[in-house]
A protein has these predicted regions:
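Polybasic, glycine- and aromatic-enriched phosphate-binding surface used to engage nucleic acids
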Residues: 1-229, 250
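Amphipathic alpha-helical coiled-coil/heptad-repeat segments
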Residues: 191, 226-267
Length: 267
């Protein structure tokens, strides 16, 4: 990509500050890949049905513990999300669950269809893996990070839209997560500076959409001294957002001309 002089200057200034996000003491993961969302992502009514079919309080408690709220990319917006009342059945291979300890859940999966859920690569089944038929396609060895506060975002978007998600909320693939509750990082990611830099690393699709892959987001240089940005709430007001933009322009030492360029940039 050939950059104009002002674009070269902006890029140079961004890269002169801090270190890439991927080099911080945090992890960036993708959301849960089930291999069959129709079976593993359920609504409130189906959740209630599965729980009501449990034969004991212990079974119900075990089952309820692995059915967790989930967000999709379309549910996530800048500094917020609109939960659609959906849940994921978290039978992750990393948990090494015994399906016989979850009779109601086992029957639900069998009613859905063993041949559709088995991970053999056969026609009509899920792709071949070493996981069991009732488990998700990915092992999700990092499931504990979903049980902590985190930053999440939709993978494909017209503009970067990051939000804080509380402990216990999951996201489905390809939505990524950053296992941190650092609000300063959240505010940096939602800035015009970050959006410009991240989009410069890939190709904008037809209609202006961009795929905010972890490999791109992880390359964003993050200043080392940004703790004072944590004074702003996880859902700032419009006035606070404007203040954050100005402060982040200052952090990256952008000139008035460069700020105006980013403010008026169209993709």
């Amino acid at each position: 990509m050939i950059l104009s002089p002002i674009e070269q200057s902006i890029k140079r200034k961004i890269e002169a500050v801090g270190k890439p996000l991927k080099d911080w003491d945090i992890q960036i993961y993708r959301g849960v890949l089930t291999g069959c969302n129709e079976a593993f992502i359920i609504d409130e009514a189906k959740r209630a049905e599965i729980l009501s079919n449990c034969q004991s309080d212990d079974e119900r408690e075990r089952t309820e513990a692995i059915i967790r709220p989930i967000l999709r990319g379309r549910d996530i917006r800048r500094y917020g999300y609109d939960w659609a009342g959906l849940y994921i059945i978290g039978t992750f291979p990393a948990l090494k669950l015994d399906i016989e300890s979850y009779p109601s859940l086992k029957q639900y999966f069998l009613d859905f269809g063993y041949d559709r859920l088995k991970q053999t690569g056969d026609k009509g089944a899920r792709k071949k893996t070493s996981n069991q038929w009732f488990e998700t396609q990915d092992s999700i060895s990092y499931w504990e990070d979903f049980e902590k506060p985190k930053i999440v975002w939709g993978n494909l978007n017209l503009k970067g839209a990051y939000t804080h998600a509380p402990a216990g909320i999951y996201v489905n693939a390809p939505c990524p997560i950053i296992a941190t509750e650092n609000l300063a990082i959240l505010h940096i990611l939602n800035s015009n500076v970050a959006d410009y830099y991240i989009r410069s690393l890939g190709v904008t699709r037809s209609g202006g959409y961009f795929e905010y892959k972890p490999m791109f987001v992880g390359k964003l240089p993050i200043p080392l001294s940004i703790d004072y940005l944590q004074a702003f709430p996880e859902t700032p007001s419009e006035d606070q957002e404007r203040m954050l933009q100005i402060m982040i322009y200052d952090i990256y030492n952008l000139s008035v001309e460069e700020r105006l360029y980013l403010e008026t940039l169209k993709y």
